[in-house]
Amino acid sequence: MALADDNFYPVALADLAMAERQHNVARLEQLRALRAERFELMERLAQLPPDMVFFTQITMEAAEDVAFLDAMRRANIKGALVGVEAVTPEGLKDVYKGFNDVGEALVTRLRTFRDHGVGVLGSFIFGLPSDRSSTFAATADIADRAGLAFAQFVMLTPYPGTVDFAAWEKSLGNNAARIGDIPVTRHWLIPQEKRPKVYAPHPVMSPDEIRARTQAVWDHFYSLRRIWVRSRVTPTIRARIAFVLLSKLYRQMYANTGIATDSARVNRANRWARLIARPCRYLFTARPLPDLQLPAAEGGAGVRARA
């Protein structure tokens, strides 16, 4: 099950420390109450059957808070999406995350999640203005050494409402290419079968070069040998097989269909994804729980869950 929260870790230790330094009592009490609510939620999740598994999204700062990570493990929150975005100081500045770690410090921080029983789906962006050909290999190396369970490597795409989109649209002006009567600056209005892949322009690399190098990183990370090594975090052979199939499915769904521009390759990837999804569904089917009780808050009574 996915805990639908764009940041499951709402109060960082740094936030608490800042409120204390500022002697902001009201803010400190507010943060502590919010933090306590999240711990209470995890205590209640921990009362559910052990085959109920949860996933969520979290910020890198959570690695500093091992008490929170341990509570996640007890709550059976097996994994979290973490937006790493970039592995170089220049790349982090491009995405306004200059406060994040790079190099060995980044590897250590990401490993902290795994060491406390929380698998990480790391998200990386390629095509940032500061990216160079060496960035791709450096990113693949970090993803390998950081002990990530899964990773996604996306190409920088200008989406409406973002600073990148506004700059891209302004740079094209009235010269934007058109598909039919629709400019590519409104690419979401173009029929799916005619819609081009739209990526932010790069100062030194072409879209084709970025696409090819991005695909190579996907191929590297999701090679069968590397997937099998990563699957050792699972407790049983059934779980290892499920991990391998899920990894291959993830790659087919997001790399081959999301990056490829050749329609034949996309169709091939879709067929493979459907084939892999069938055994995945069987392996991930849980036993029925007709008498499942919703965990009670402290001092309360449990409530029977509705089917």
Model-found features: residue ranges?
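Generic enzyme active-site microenvironment
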Residues: 3-4, 83
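Glycine-rich Rossmann NAD(P)(H)-binding loop
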Residues: 4-10
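Membrane-proximal basic amphipathic "stem/tether" segments
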Residues: 12-29, 225-307
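Catalytic P-loop NTPase motifs of RecA-like helicase/translocase cores
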Residues: 10-11, 90
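A structural motif corresponding to the C-terminal lobe/cap of the Radical SAM core domain
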Residues: 19-238, 295-298, 302-307
